Amino acid sequence: MLGVVGVLLLVAFATLLLWDFLWRRRGNGILPGPRPLPFLGNLLMYRGLDPEQIMDFVKKNQRKYGRLYRVWILHQLAVFSTDPRDIEFVLSSQQHITKNNLYKLLNCWLGDGLLMSTGRKWHGRRKIITPTFHFKILEQFVEIFDQQSAVMVEQLQSRADGKTPINIFPVICLTALDIIAETAMGTKINAQKNPNLPYVQAVNDVTNILIKRFIHAWQRVDWIFRLTQPTEAKRQDKAIKVMHDFTENIIRERRETLVNNSKETTPEEEVNFLGQKRRMALLDVLLQSTIDGAPLSDEDIREEVDTFMFEGHDTTTSAISFCLYEISRHPEVQQRLQQEIRDVLGEDRKSPVTLRDLGELKFMENVIKESLRLHPPVPMIGRWFAEDVEIRGKHIPAGTNFTMGIFVLLRDPEYFESPDEFRPERFDADVPQIHPYAYIPFSAGPRNCIGQKFAMLEMKSTVSKLLRHFELLPLGPEPRHSMNIVLRSANGVHLGLKPRA
């Protein structure tokens, strides 16, 4: 009897090996890449790899296998590219808009919002949200950028002694959180003055937990995470409930306000208790929108508001923090920025800025663009192929995860001379143009960042506000890039501040 069982087990094992070989053969002949092991694929390559090593790992593979290569993670085929031709083919397509499996990590928080949805649902939501970034609404948002940046300056005054390194990342994080809450939900959460508020703490808790799950691949599988990390799973669920409850309460309150208002009054015509015209927020647009004649449900709206809260504070925090770091390390750039700010905004540091003012800060825009090149907030972009795809004559089967190494591409010497140097003049109008998909810090194509104009205005407003009040000093250690959900620094982003006379 035991002999029969042994034979059956041996046959089963041999069948699995044969299936494994045949399954992988469909991908191994496509592109160059490391030789996979049975069952495990190339999983062992990632053993011990921490977030600070990921980009060097991608560069090493690129040197060895070329700009387009494949790896196997268990039985999942993954293709990597750092070639703008491949990236253009994928990102410009209306068919390949499904995010790859890694993004599923965010489902617990964001649900099926604009970042996560695909197909007809994504098209419908994108069409609804696009008007939120119309010129007239952005103009109203600039006032919020300016006011919340002023709070940031006030909070930093006591720390600006000209000799103490400040980790600017958490400071900018709270500022960005205040800005996105007021612009997306139309409500002030005062995160900068009350960083221990339950909602603010919940955002920080979930972000930190998701970062850990991103780093440890096995924790990305939800049931494994809950089985092996039950305390963290409960903490994550509790924090998500706090955020969802908060957003849902805001939605209910705003919906009731709209219902109770006169039918003749539009949100643009509403005024507050001071007699000032009420600003439109993303939430107002969503509450008044319909898809196929039906209004969005509260859950639909919550997904979109939560998506904006995530994308509007984490990526912006990364972008602004690294930009301030670069300015602090390049005094000639800082001096030129100061002159431009005086020329455009004047000498009165308390005077509010306008949308037109921010548009005239041309050199600052170059500085921000160059910082985004060196420190892209989203270092990788992923897609999942629902059908067979041919890229440069290479057949790639359906079910493949396709990852675009934006961080590596933006430092490629073929497209950027002296790529590790900070040179804002790269973006001067008279500089010869490079491949349009070689510089895509906001992604590109139909799924590009819908809020990139919003983000650029927010960055200009925040950076200019700091420079009007402080000199940025090169204090503290150099940041160590850490590839998480967004680009961070493992040791913070440090600089010094000295009040301007």
UniProtKB/Swiss-Prot annotation:
Top class in the EC scheme: oxidoreductase
Residues holding heme: 311, 449
Keyword flag Translocase: no
Keyword Kinase found: no
Major localisation: endoplasmic reticulum
A GO term, aspect molecular function: monooxygenase activity
GO cellular component terms attached to this protein's record: endoplasmic reticulum membrane
Keywords (A to Z) from UniProt: Endoplasmic reticulum, Heme, Iron, Membrane, Metal-binding, Microsome, Monooxygenase, Oxidoreductase
Taxonomic superkingdom: Eukaryota
Cofactors, names only: heme
Entries under CDD domains matching the protein: CYP4
SUPFAM superfamilies on file: Cytochrome P450 (SSF48264)
UniProt membrane topology term: Peripheral membrane protein
Record localization: Endoplasmic reticulum membrane; Microsome membrane
Classification via Gene3D superfamilies: Cytochrome P450
Function: Involved in the metabolism of insect hormones and in the breakdown of synthetic insecticides.
Protein's name according to its UniProt entry: Cytochrome P450 4d2
Originating organism: Drosophila melanogaster
